[in-house]
């Protein structure tokens, strides 16, 4: 996991970004300038590659890329109105704000790499997928172990010439096979 990114590093990046790239809408520039001017807001800002799963996010685009110029969302509400976004950012300054920036060569920019963070919600999703894979592996392992133990018990019943136990264990084996189909 990446070390914490300082407020000054984030502010320096925003200033560099605004000097280097022209936003598709001037309101996007205003919002970024406002954020950079308030340490208490910058503290809660996270630059991410995608906003999937984030509760509150801002997607901004510079000229030269094919993306929406300005999108703000909070929960299930999405808007392209910069004033609504500005007011939410101003009034809820102590809530996490995830920002996705679209600009030419974003993924190869060392300045952006310095402040970019992993989306924690995407990581949770991956963890869930890994959990499902682990659960499936455990289920399969337990079934294989149980089946092997049952086959051994069937062999033991045959060796002991115990028909009642043999038939009982074979029924269990057939039930097991039906569940796996």
Curated annotation (Swiss-Prot):
Pfam families per UniProt: IDEAL, UPF0302
Listed InterPro entries: IDEAL_dom (IPR014957), UPF0302 (IPR011188), UPF0302_N (IPR014963), UPF0302_N_sf (IPR038091), Virus_scaffolding_prot_C (IPR027393)
Entry superkingdom: Bacteria
Family to which the UniProt record says this protein belongs: Belongs to the UPF0302 family.
Record HAMAP family: UPF0302 (MF_00760)
Name of the molecule in the record: UPF0302 protein lwe1947
């Amino acid at each position: 996991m990446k070390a914490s990114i300082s407020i000054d590093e984030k502010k320096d990046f925003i200033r560099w970004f605004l000097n280097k790239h022209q936003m598709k809408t001037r309101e996007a520039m205003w919002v970024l300038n406002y954020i950079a001017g308030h340490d208490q807001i910058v503290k809660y800002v996270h630059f991410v590659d995608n906003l999937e799963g984030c509760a509150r996010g801002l997607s901004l685009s510079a000229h030269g890329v094919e993306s929406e110029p300005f999108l703000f969302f909070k929960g299930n509400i999405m808007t392209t109105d910069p004033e609504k976004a500005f007011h939410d950012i101003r009034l809820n300054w102590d809530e996490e704000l995830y920002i996705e920036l679209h600009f030419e060569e974003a993924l190869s920019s060392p300045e952006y790499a310095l402040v970019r963070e992993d989306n924690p919600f995407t990581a949770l999703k991956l963890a869930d997928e890994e959990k499902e894979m682990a659960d499936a592996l455990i289920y399969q392992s337990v079934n294989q172990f149980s089946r092997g133990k049952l086959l051994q018990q069937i062999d033991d019943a045959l060796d002991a010439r115990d028909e009642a136990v043999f038939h009982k264990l074979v029924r269990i084996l057939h039930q097991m096979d039906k569940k796996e189909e």
